[in-house]
Amino acid sequence: MLFLRSAAFNLSFYAMSVVMVIGCSPLFLLPRSLTFKAMALWSHATLWLLRVIAGTNYEIRGALPHGPVLVASKHQSMWDTVVMTAILNRPAMVLKRELLWIPFYGWYAQKSRMIAIDRSAAASAVRRLIAQGKAAIAEGRPIVIFPEGTRSAPGTKLEYKPGIAALYRQLGVACVPAAVNSGLFWARRGFARKPGTIVLEFLEPIPPGLDRKSFMETLETRVETAAARLAGEAGGPSAIATRAVEKA
């Protein structure tokens, strides 16, 4: 049953995405605000399909970030970008430049002025990151960045990249850490979409003005501690797998 439900979701998700992405293409010629609405609609539709077909719900904890703020989140799944697009107002996502080359997806990212960085050019990438970050903050948008730079499996921690510290120092805004347990239900490069409740928790904001070392230590401690707690609440990978079999 898990296989069938996962297959049904994946087919529905890709079919819906193709229809919406192509159908909303004329928005490229219209004001950017309409592109944001289309992206939010796609995200809500994805979450709805996930709930109805796969039995995967979600819960948001903590205060929802508003306005010009830096959101630094644990990244375990594609779900993370989907939900951030659904619940935040005009988020500016930090993403790798290669994603801009994907037809339609890259066009939407450029139209909505997402922050694309070239990870092969360290110094210039940081300068570009800061310049685009300042532009997003000036527009009153929240910036969403995944400090590890890529998705990590539940229970693992990757090195936090220097870009987050540079943004925090240069932008002069609060940083809201965030933790998830999404990888237990929608794993990176995984086919299965497991039933249960994904939790995204926004943690206590870190005020501007800390030195680099204090900021990074505070950020990593809060995010990793919360991520471990959320994984424990869900029972970890073995418990998720057992519940999936029981519901089959």
What are these regions (language model features)?
Residues 1-57:
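N-terminal membrane-anchoring alpha-helices
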Residues 21-39, 51-53, 69-122:
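Catalytic core of membrane glycerolipid acyltransferases/transacylases, capturing the structured
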Residues 50-51, 109, 136, 168:
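A generic structural signal for well-ordered alpha-helical segments
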Residues 60, 71, 93-94, 200-202:
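Generic preference for hydrophobic
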Residues 61-65:
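Glycine-rich helix-loop-beta junction characteristic of Rossmann-like nucleotide cofactor-binding loops
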Residues 68-73, 141-145:
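Generic beta-sheet signal
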Residues 126-248:
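Non-catalytic C-terminal accessory region of glycerolipid acyltransferases
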